[in-house]
Amino acid sequence: GMIPTKEITPHVPVLVAEIVADVKRACELGITMVHLHAREPVTEEPTYKKEIYAEIIGGIREFAPDLIICVSLSGRNFKALTQRADPLYLEGNLKPDMGSLTLSYLNFNQTASLNAHTML
């Protein structure tokens, strides 16, 4: 997800290689679908950038070409639809199968995720 950090738990995968390795272990247990969040490699902050999603998806497709891949299009940190939809512009086997684009208002523990009325 977007919230856990290495400070909160050392077990959260935040780097591309960590995410891919965790998905591989889950595939070995029999998953057929995965929901991904991407992080900036240096800051480990959540990101919408398709280039980072491409690295993750490409790594997964090497060992699980039929796995259904859903990417986060969260508006919690990035409000513009162009940013949120960026991973959907990937092509070929790097294109995700699904994207979770939540357009409603969501209440979280410490904050709310709000969308502009024009996006609703």
Predicted regions and their residues:
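Glycine-rich, proline-tolerant flexible connector loops at the mouths of alpha/beta enzymes
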Residues: 7, 32-56
